[in-house]
Amino acid sequence: MGKRAFAQSLYKDLKFLDLGEPDNLENLLNNFAYIKNIKIKDEELCKKNLLSKNNFAYVKEEEDFNFNAVFNIHLAVRNLLERGQDALSLFNLIKNFKVIICDEIGAGVVPLDKFERRWRDETGLLYQALVREADRVDRVWAGLALRLK
């Protein structure tokens, strides 16, 4: 069982926002509506992922931006750092999501590249801040979940 499947086993009503998609990060940062172009042919899958028959996912109004779970935070941090922005600026934007899925970077290996080290460190600092605020923390590794908090 992966991290998202584990989260869905705990909460049935999750609606995930992928922050690895630059458009999604931009929309979150700017409080814009969610717009994403995806090529999917299966209509049932389209319904589950808010896709219209034209293969567009969209939410027309700001108040409809009601995602309650977020993932690929590490990619959003990288995107922000590449643009010279502060990674911790994400904290206030995502701390109130019901589920926040974090990915480990480097498995404890310190990268040689300066930017890669900074990405790893700032992502870790953001994760620490999120864990301090969290009511519950679980680590899912190789399909097994371990409750940490």
Would you name each region that the model predicts?
Residues 1, 22-27, 45, 65, ...:
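A short acidic, often aromatic-flanked loop/helix-cap motif at beta-alpha or helix-coil junctions
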Residues 1-27, 32:
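Glycine-rich P-loop/Walker A and Walker A-like loops and their local beta1-loop-alpha1 context
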Residues 20, 73-74, 105:
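Anionic group-transfer/hydrolysis microenvironments
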Residues 27-96:
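Conserved nucleotide-sensing/catalytic segment adjacent to the nucleotide-binding pocket
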